[in-house]
């Protein structure tokens, strides 16, 4: 299972929001590229980038920064946030992005998603951002009447490669992942799923790892890494390739490059 660090971009900085609230912004670093290189050095198998400006406005505000990050890394990068047109997705892939995570457009223009999935097989994923089980859109500012499980089944039928499931009410809270909701989703789709939202500790990572036989392939971690509640190297050793059965205590400390 992949443990995937998240870098949320807002105004060119690395930030975290609490439950997707743009009024509750914590700036963790002014240089997202330095953060990306740091996570790669600690063993991240891939990186999850979110353009929060684009998620809110639909305009790619951090396009150049994303390209710079992708060009500087050796690990694959997946990007979400505000990808609502064919051109926006094509531009990202031209920059070397590995996967595009589509959100709002999956509800508003499913035919476009199906077309993109056919054009870029294996590279189009859908972000299922759920509030009380219902899909939220436009940077989580609006909540639909569509269940995440229903959207997942529709999108799987249209050929998307997988899903990133985020429990909005747990995102940025360190309250632990929503295991029951993940089980429900995994039960209705045969596509791989990446979990996001609330992951706070190595125990949470191990709880998610128990779902891998059912199709869970990764966990996105944000605040727990930035507040040092979790050590990325330990998490990767615990559930990644060549994982250790016993995790030694981390007696050292880490600092930014």
From Swiss-Prot:
Protein localization: Cytoplasm
InterPro entries cross-referenced by the UniProt entry: Aldolase_TIM, His_biosynth, HisA_bact_arch, Isoase_HisA-like, Isoase_HisA-like_bact, RibuloseP-bd_barrel
Record's keyword terms, sorted: Amino-acid biosynthesis, Cytoplasm, Histidine biosynthesis, Isomerase
Listed EC numbers: 5.3.1.16
Active site: 8 (proton acceptor), 129 (proton donor)
Pathway: Amino-acid biosynthesis; L-histidine biosynthesis; L-histidine from 5-phospho-alpha-D-ribose 1-diphosphate: step 4/9
Claim: Amino-acid biosynthesis is one of the keywords in the record: yes
Gene3D superfamilies linked: Aldolase class I
Designated name of the protein: 1-(5-phosphoribosyl)-5-[(5-phosphoribosylamino)methylideneamino] imidazole-4-carboxamide isomerase
Gene: hisA
